[in-house]
């Protein structure tokens, strides 16, 4: 029997604010444990929360970027549960009046994992609908040692935005693409750095399976706190197969909360799945209703940048790039800006794009440390090729040196003496030498075997250590053979 997976994601995004959601404590990753805390984020009696305006604006901005409906009013609620890293024994969140409802994320071809990528030219693009976007506070972080445990409350109270998708996702690969596309939008809007290693983007997955074609959905399980996009894909692959195996043997799926054990490569039960009523939500009496219309929405609208899909379209139209080139360059706003700066003074814009995509990204493993190379270097390199002073193979080698040594193409050419030989006089002599040294190739060429010309070209290229202009050599050989034939 064939089965179908039904998947929905809850993505928690740490907002890019200077201070916490309800107090003035600094948000600082890696600070000394419990050094960024106060009575408010420690939940001490009598300490009253005060909402962070910037966090509210960033949440509204996200909703606008996703095409959500912005609520005229939003409120904060207490989500009650006990956990050691929750100092108040409740979390301030939003229940029935979130700041944003609806919206969608479009899956673009290059967002899929490399071993499952779609055709960049494909016209059909699936959209994953958004249920809601709401604001809540983060909890502290537990640390477990050999004989005891500790809690760092520096993270408690950090602004978190939760983005809940509809259960529109049908495979681990679509989940991967959704997270990649969503992260791209958030980075473009400068809402969050989305650094998963620092816990700035975490994901909970709801997944169930059902016989293909059946309308009724199966019993869902939730996999908590997945901290990488690849982990989401791996966890879903395993859990889908586990549920299919359970159903195939005639057993039933238990609704439960799971965690992903990366070392064992399997999901592990944590507890039975909670329902909304288990949390006893009620409005937070210490916080007023948030009125979004007017100033807050106006400020959020000002911050909306050119979004990824818009940038891809513009790169295609302005620079005559194809879908693949524009998608790669637009995958990161920093890379796209870098390309545009490089292309501004290049005679061949497409060549600059190809150098960045095919050569630069292959050797620059860390974009943030690689980008300080002046963008003008790629314009200069492209122009040297256009002017016939370098051929493509030399240019590709120069990119490696540029990244490693932070030197300009002109400086590298001068230091290594690798400029292209374009002198007709010099190359004419070498072509005559090639003809004299390779009588069989000459005979083959004159008898109609045109490919024999490559042997003569190879002779000249070897003599010049690859520095001869291949097109000039080709033309001179044809001309000389014709004149001496």
Curated annotation (Swiss-Prot):
InterPro entries the UniProt entry points to: Asn/Gln-tRNA_amidoTrfase_suB/E (IPR017959), Asn/Gln-tRNA_Trfase_suB/E_cat (IPR006075), Asn/Gln_amidotransferase (IPR018027), Asn/Gln_tRNA_amidoTrase-B-like (IPR003789), GatB (IPR004413), GatB_C_1 (IPR042114), GatB_Yqey_C_2 (IPR023168), Gln-tRNA_amidoTrfase_suB_CS (IPR017958)
An example molecular function term from Gene Ontology annotations: ATP binding
Keyword ATP-binding belongs to the record: yes
Biological process terms in GO annotation: glutaminyl-tRNAGln biosynthesis via transamidation; translation
Catalytic activity, EC: 6.3.5.-
Function: Allows the formation of correctly charged Asn-tRNA(Asn) or Gln-tRNA(Gln) through the transamidation of misacylated Asp-tRNA(Asn) or Glu-tRNA(Gln) in organisms which lack either or both of asparaginyl-tRNA or glutaminyl-tRNA synthetases. The reaction takes place in the presence of glutamine and ATP through an activated phospho-Asp-tRNA(Asn) or phospho-Glu-tRNA(Gln).
Family: Belongs to the GatB/GatE family. GatB subfamily.
This protein's name: Aspartyl/glutamyl-tRNA(Asn/Gln) amidotransferase subunit B
Species this protein is from: Methylacidiphilum infernorum (isolate V4)
């Amino acid at each position: 029997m064939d089965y179908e997976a039904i998947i929905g994601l809850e993505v928690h995004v740490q907002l890019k604010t200077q201070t916490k959601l309800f107090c003035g404590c600094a948000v600082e990753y890696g600070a000394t444990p419990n050094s960024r805390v106060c009575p408010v984020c420690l939940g001490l009696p009598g300490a009253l929360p005060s909402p962070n305006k910037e966090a509210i604006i960033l949440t509204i901005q996200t909703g606008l970027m996703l095409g959500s409906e912005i609520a005229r009013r939003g409120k904060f609620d207490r989500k009650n549960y006990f956990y050691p890293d929750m100092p108040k024994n409740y979390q301030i969140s939003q229940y029935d009046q979130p700041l944003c409802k609806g919206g969608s994320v479009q899956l673009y071809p290059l967002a899929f994992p490399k071993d499952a990528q779609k055709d960049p030219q494909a016209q059909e693009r699936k959209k994953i609908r958004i249920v809601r976007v709401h604001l809540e506070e983060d909890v502290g972080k537990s640390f477990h040692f050999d004989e005891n445990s500790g809690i760092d409350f520096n993270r408690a109270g950090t602004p978190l935005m939760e983005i809940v998708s509809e259960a529109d996702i049908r495979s681990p690969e679509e989940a991967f693409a959704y997270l990649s596309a969503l992260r791209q939008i958030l980075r473009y809007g400068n809402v969050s750095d989305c650094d998963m290693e620092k816990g700035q983007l975490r994901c909970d997955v709801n997944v169930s399976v059902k016989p293909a074609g059946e309308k009724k959905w199966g019993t869902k399980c939730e996999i908590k706190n997945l901290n990488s996009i690849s982990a989401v894909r791996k966890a879903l692959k395993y859990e889908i197969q586990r549920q299919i195996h359970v159903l195939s043997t005639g057993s039933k799926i238990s609704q439960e909360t799971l965690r992903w054990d990366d070392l064992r490569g399997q999901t592990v039960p944590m507890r039975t799945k909670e329902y909304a009523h288990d949390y006893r939500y009620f409005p937070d009496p210490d916080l007023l209703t948030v009125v979004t219309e007017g100033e807050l929405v106006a400020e959020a609208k000002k911050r909306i940048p050119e979004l990824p899909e818009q940038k891809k379209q513009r790169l295609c139209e302005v620079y005559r790039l194809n879908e693949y080139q524009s998608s790669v360059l637009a995958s990161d706003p920093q890379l796209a800006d870098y390309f545009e700066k490089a292309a501004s003074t290049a005679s061949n814009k497409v060549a600059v794009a190809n150098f960045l995509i095919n050569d630069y990204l292959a050797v620059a493993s860390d974009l943030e440390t690689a980008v300080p190379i002046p963008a003008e270097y790629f314009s200069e390199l492209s122009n040297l090729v256009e002017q016939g002073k370098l051929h493509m193979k030399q240019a590709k080698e120069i990119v490696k040196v540029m990244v490693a040594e932070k030197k300009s193409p002109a400086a590298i050419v001068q230091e290594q003496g690798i400029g292209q030989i374009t002198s007709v006089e010099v190359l004419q002599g070498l072509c005559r030498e090639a003809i004299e040294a390779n009588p069989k190739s000459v005979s083959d060429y004159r008898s109609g075997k045109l490919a024999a010309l490559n042997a003569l070209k190879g002779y000249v290229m070897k003599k010049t250590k690859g520095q001869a202009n291949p097109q000039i050599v080709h033309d001179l050989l044809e001309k000389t053979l014709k004149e001496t034939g």
